[in-house]
Amino acid sequence: MPQRTTLTPRELDCLHWSALGKTSWETARILGIAARTVDFHLANACAKLGVANRRAAVARAVQCGLLPALTA
């Protein structure tokens, strides 16, 4: 993983909603974009964070301080 990972605001939006358990379809409805676009942003975030899936991307983003940790 690069020392400084920079995610776009939309990638962070998609990761945020994914962290809350939303599907791509649900996130798309919330953000007013297509579900495929959500998948595109999540795939880019995964690549930038050096992980294989959205769960790992959320965990890495929290670890890097890009997303706040969720509490129950």
Describe the function of each predicted region.
Residues M1-T37:
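Helix-turn-helix DNA-binding segment
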Residues Q3, R29, A47, V62-Q63:
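Short polybasic/polar patches that bind polyanions
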Residues L12-H16, C46, V58:
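Hydrophobic residues on short alpha-helical segments
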Residues K22, A35, C46, G65-L66:
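Residue-level detector of secondary-structure transition/capping positions
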Residues T37-D39, V51:
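Intrinsically disordered, low-complexity peptide-like regions
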Residues H41-N44:
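Residues within the DNA-recognition helix of helix-turn-helix
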Residues K48-A72:
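Basic, Lys/Arg-enriched C-terminal extension of HTH/homeodomain DNA-binding domains
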